Every structure is written in structure tokens, then in C-alpha cells.
């Protein structure tokens, strides 16, 4: 039930911590029984269950509305007549940014890591001595799963994107939409660094032609080619940013050209698209 919840935003039983009389009834009881018995018979292999769910027609549905009567008959989508649009968790969003830029360190296991914070994030900490940055720079881009979590202190980016307090049970994470989330994507130095890295990757893999660069950014970050309208708008934006490229992005090498600066800003804009942060 909880693995189903991770993929669909809601479990087959919505009260994930309560299967008793006070909890809700399952929306698909026979499906829940079938998944549970199959999971046990398969040796409790979580990856196989993920694969089974993600290959299903139900998971691969669009989140767009179908027939008008669907909304009338099942407004909460409990019967799963469409996909629930779901925002990535904080850790997954961190991973997505670094995977797109090509800097994600996918090493498994080991102790918690402590990535560097921006100056304003450090200034906001009450107990700054808790955040001792890992000495090895290669550790700074580990998966979000490995970032240090303390009971009384959370990684600021995770705090902004609704990571729960780890001192109490949390059956379902809250999903908020607040201004600090947009400000993190637009202004945080770590996102700037990854935008610069993505721009460098695109130049290396797609060459120097702007249309090819734009198409490659879309394929890396969004998993698809841009529409003709998106490609046209992105090309105009890239040309305008190149003309205006005077202020340098943080951590951009001095050798980066105006085109490189403009491309990095375009990559930053793509990181901030709703489509990048949501499973649709």
C-alpha cells in the first residue's frame, strides 16, 4: 500500500498508518490483496513491485481529464481513471537537478554527507556548528538520500520542499506551494552551479548550434523534444540573453562565453518549469 502511495500520491488505503476500524476502506481491495500476496511470493523484492506498478496501464495514464462524467462520478479520482499529478519529493528533486547536469554521484552506501550551503542559508542557521561541510567535493553531489538529517536541524532545501519532521511518524508528506520554493529554484547558488554544468554538458554533447542545444536541454531535463512553439520561444530568449550577458552567474568559469552564460540561464529557466518538478 505504501509503495503504491509513493507512485500515485495516495495509497489504495488512504490512511496509510491505520488499516483498522478507524481507517478508510481500500478503494481496490482485490488489487491490494493481489499485490500483497504477489509481493510476498516474490521474496519481498521491492524493485520487482516498482517495475510491476510502473509498467501498468494505470500508472502510464495521462493526468488530463477524460470524459466529463468521470469528474462528476469520482471527483477525488479514487478509482484512478486518470493519473494523479505528483510533485517530486525534496530528495528526488535534488537528484533530478544533479542528474540532468551530469554531476550526480550515484555511489551507494557510506556515512551521511554535508553539502555546502549558500551564505544566506548559513546566516539563517541558529546553530551553525551543526553544518560541517564534507571535505571531499565529490560528496557534495551525492543523492539526496545521503544528505545529513538531524532531529533538530534540516537541510534548508529539504525544509522548503516539505520534508517531514523525523521525530514523529509521517504516513503522508504534505505538499505545499509556497514562495520560498520558487525563490530556491531561481536564486539558490547550488541551482546556479548545476545550470552552468548542464550548459557545459549540452555544448559538449550537442555542439554549438543553438537549435540543437535547445533540443538537447529539453531531452535531458524533460525527457522529450520541444514543441515548435517552445523551440521558437527558447531561441528568441537565448538570443536576447546572449545580447544582455553582462552579469556572470555564480561559479561560472571566466572562459565561459556570452552564449554559454545565456545557455546556463536558459537551463536555469528549464529547471524552474513545472514539468521538471512534477510526475505527470
Model-inferred region functions:
Residues 81, 146-148:
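Residues in well-ordered beta-strands of folded domains
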Residues 266:
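Globin-like tetrapyrrole-binding proteins
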